[in-house]
A protein has these predicted regions:
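N-terminal hydrophobic or amphipathic helices/low-complexity stretches enriched
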Residues: 32-105, 110, 114, 119, ...
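Second-shell loop/turn segments in exported
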Residues: 60-70, 91-106, 172-176, 200-210, ...
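Sec/Tat-exported extracytoplasmic proteins
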Residues: 69, 73, 78, 82-89, ...
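Noncatalytic luminal/extracellular "stalk/propeptide" segments of secretory-pathway proteins
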Residues: 76-79, 88-194, 201
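Structural recognition of the beta-strand scaffold that forms the well-ordered cores
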Residues: 77-82, 125-126, 176, 194-198, ...
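Soluble metallo-hydrolase cores and metallopeptidase-like ectodomains found primarily
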Residues: 152-187, 242-316, 327-330, 334-335, ...
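Metal-dependent peptidase/peptidase-like ectodomains
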Residues: 258, 297-299, 349-451
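His/Asp/Glu-rich mid-to-C-terminal helical/loop segments that flank catalytic regions of hydrolases
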Residues: 457-504
Length: 504
């Protein structure tokens, strides 16, 4: 026991000394002024997080030709494209970005068309598609009141395809159901109320627990009048989510705002949430895929694609992919036609967030359009800062996030792709995806295809900005894809397609 007391005493004295306090013989605590000799030697240093300080793979010997694909040059395209989104915001649109069917979407198409013509591509054209009726939110708000206090929840964002609120809005009692599992709903009356769900990002807006554990539909089926979902991401990010909670007004909300609401619910009785959501259904909108071609020396082709519509600034999704596609168009435009075995078709595909009409058209016409396609490459979500949640912070690193990857084709094609990723330092997941996601998903099995894609914390959020798209990642992916095209052009198409099922 004496030893324990002695140890505690030492710890206590150490703690008081660290606090700049000592205990005198009279028992009173006295503040001791620190001198230069007693001050902590620790200085809070910072590591610059700009494009010059991200980890970067040195250009391997023998791969010097790909050095023309420079990250800083590619990133200028990201800035040019996201500027269109910023104009959409600055013009006063609440639902802003390069939204399919809007003039900002068409402005982006013009950037691509002008670039294709500048690079000398041939058969530059727009392929127009009529969009299905689009439900576009035009005005919304949410406040919570209780205990004499009212808070405005500024990060609420209507879910895509959400139902509108009744004229005059709704005033509802909020009910917290945690993750929204069957156990969370057990014994809770949510009928006619606002159901509040905390969702685990796995890793972000496109894939999260409220979707895959059925929480959203569970709320609707139990009679909820409205739905509010928050991704457990530190900070106060505003997300564009596909809540899919049935025919009720549905919203996402940032973590800090959710915390304010939860604390109000904990401290005050009879909390009420007022919400308003106006939605306009617009018909007659259209969108275009923008095409350009570099002729080869055979009747076969390679297709390199990237969709151009986006929510918010959409730097990762998908200005990053567009920049790589445009960089590859410029790179291969400088290769003489006699050295291009196959025609390379570049396309900025239309309406990804409105049904992926561009890639669906390719699939619908695969018997003719893809009959001689040796490879499709989808450039989507290709470079984003790797982050780590740490306490109440989302901490950035000086590394590019790993990507999910997909190959539909022969073992030889897979080896070509993975070797190129290793050569240029493109980090990928261990296992290949069981299915292609993104715009590639609609056409992925119609011809040999590859893609890398990642949809992390910043995806579909107002923090998907220029600064979270490292030039180093753009550069690595562009160089890898260029090398893959060169390698594939040395392989016959029959050796790129998947082996027949059941063959060895």
């Amino acid at each position: 026991m004496t030893g324990v007391k002695w140890t505690f005493g030492i710890v206590a004295v150490a703690a008081t000394l660290l606090a700049g306090v000592v205990v005198s013989s009279s028992g009173r605590a006295e503040v001791v002024q620190e001198t230069p000799s007693t001050q902590s030697p620790v200085t809070k240093h910072t590591y610059p997080l700009d494009d010059a300080h991200y980890l970067r793979w040195a250009l391997p010997k023998g791969e010097e030709a790909y050095g023309r694909l420079e990250g800083e040059r590619l990133k200028r395209w990201v800035d040019t494209i996201t500027a269109v989104s910023r104009k959409s915001r600055d013009d006063g649109n609440r639902f802003w970005g390069r939204i399919a069917g809007t003039k900002y979407d068409e402005m982006t198409e013009q950037i691509v068309e002008d670039a294709f013509r500048q690079f000398g591509l041939q058969n530059v054209r727009r392929q127009w598609f009529d969009l299905p009726p689009q439900r576009l939110p035009t005005a919304w708000s949410m406040t919570a009141s209780g205990g004499g206090k009212t808070i405005e929840l500024t990060t609420v964002q209507p879910a895509r395809e959400s139902a509108a609120a009744p004229h005059g809005g709704l005033e509802l009692e909020p009910v917290w159901v945690g993750l929204g599992t069957e156990s969370d709903f057990k014994g809770r009356d949510v009928k006619g109320k606002l159901v509040v769900i905390q969702s685990v990002p796995t890793p972000g807006a496109i894939n999260n627990s409220a979707g895959w554990n059925g929480a959203n539909m569970r709320a609707s089926e139990r009679g909820a009048a409205a739905l509010l979902v928050s991704l457990a991401v530190p900070g106060n990010l505003q997300y564009q989510m596909w809540v899919r909670g049935g025919p009720i007004p549905s919203f996402s909300i940032g973590t800090d705002d959710l915390t304010s609401l939860r604390e109000l619910m904990e401290k005050a009785s009879n909390v009420k949430v007022k919400l308003q959501l106006d939605v306009e259904e617009r018909s007659g909108l259209r969108d275009a895929s923008v095409w350009g071609e570099l002729p080869g020396t055979s009747d076969e082709d390679i297709i390199i694609m990237a969709h151009h519509d986006a929510y918010f600034e959409g730097a990762l999704d998908n200005a990053s992919g567009m920049s790589v596609m445009l960089g590859l168009a410029e790179y291969f435009s400088k290769i003489p036609q006699a050295q291009r075995r196959r025609t390379i078709k570049f396309v900025s595909t239309s309406g990804h967030h409105a049904g992926s009409l561009g890639t669906k058209w390719m699939s619908d016409n695969k018997a003719t359009f893809l009959a001689r396609t040796a490879l499709m490459i989808n450039c989507e979500h290709v470079s984003v800062t790797q982050t780590y949640p740490w306490g109440a912070q989302l901490r950035k690193s000086n590394q590019v996030d790993a990507r999910r990857w997909w190959v539909f084709g022969s073992q030889r094609l897979a080896e070509v792709a993975l070797d190129a990723y290793r050569t240029f330092g493109v980090a990928v997941y261990h296992e290949m995806e069981p299915n292609a996601s993104g715009d590639m998903g609609h056409v992925s099995r119609d011809a040999p295809s590859i893609q890398m894609i990642e949809s992390p914390n910043f995806y579909h959020s107002d923090h998907d900005r220029l600064e979270v798209v490292p030039a180093a990642g753009l550069e690595a992916v562009a160089r890898a894809y260029a090398k893959i095209v060169d390698q594939v052009n040395r392989i016959d198409r029959k050796d790129l397609v998947p082996a027949p099922r059941g063959s060895n």
